[in-house]
Amino acid sequence: MAYRILFIDEQKKYQNNFLDYVEQKNIEDVEAIVKYPESSIDDMINVVYEELADAVVTDFRLNEYKTDIKYNIDYDGADLLHSLRERRKGFPCFILTSYDGDAVEESQDVNVVYDKSVINPYTEKSERVSFLEKIIKQIDHYRKTIDNAEKELCDLIEKRSKEEASLEDEERLIELDNLLESSVDRRGEIPAEFKKLSNQSRLSELIKKADEIISKYETIS
């Protein structure tokens, strides 16, 4: 299965660095896509969806240089990471920066922040696991989480249709449904109060919605 990695930077030279870096690593089925940041964060997130990206690598200070773009960017890489993960829980995102302290503080996660030198194919430090391999590992982990949730959800739906589900099963079904919806786009998530399984019509709606989410996810995998 291919890995589509979207790289976002306002400077063409770093876009080229990333393309060269991925090419040099020569890992099978990795496709690098480079984009300039959109002026608004919502437009940028739409690009992520349109490109069917499996992971996003973004510069931290997206509005710092105006050599290749002439418009203003009203967000930084940490803002983009937070917005993506609000919509897709656990989605693989990484920030590259020359300003480690600021990026770590704003992202609130030291594990997603890397020095920009990691994508320079001529200066990358020798590491047991390369930056690109770490990205792929996170994509695999995210996909496995979704796959496992899909399988468990289908099992619970079948169990509930046979009237064999316990209260704990019903609660877990709702939890899994939330996870799958958020993995596609949390803006489409059903409010928790609607998901109270107090009658058969609500259960039927939940099952229908779960099937739609699984189908939607399969079309973008």
Segment roles from a protein language model:
Residues 35-55, 63:
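Acidic, metal-coordinating helix/loop segments flanking the phosphotransfer/catalytic sites
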Residues 56-58, 84:
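Receiver (REC) domain switch-region micro-motif
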Residues 140-221:
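C-terminal output/effector regions of signal-responsive regulators
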Residues 120-154:
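The C-terminal output helix
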Residues 64-76:
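Short, flexible/disordered intra-domain loops and linkers
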Residues 2-26:
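Conserved acidic segment of CheY-like receiver
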Residues 105-126:
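Short, electropositive alpha-helical surface patch
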Residues 79-86, 90-103:
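A short, hydrophobic beta-strand element within the central beta-sheet of small alpha/beta folds
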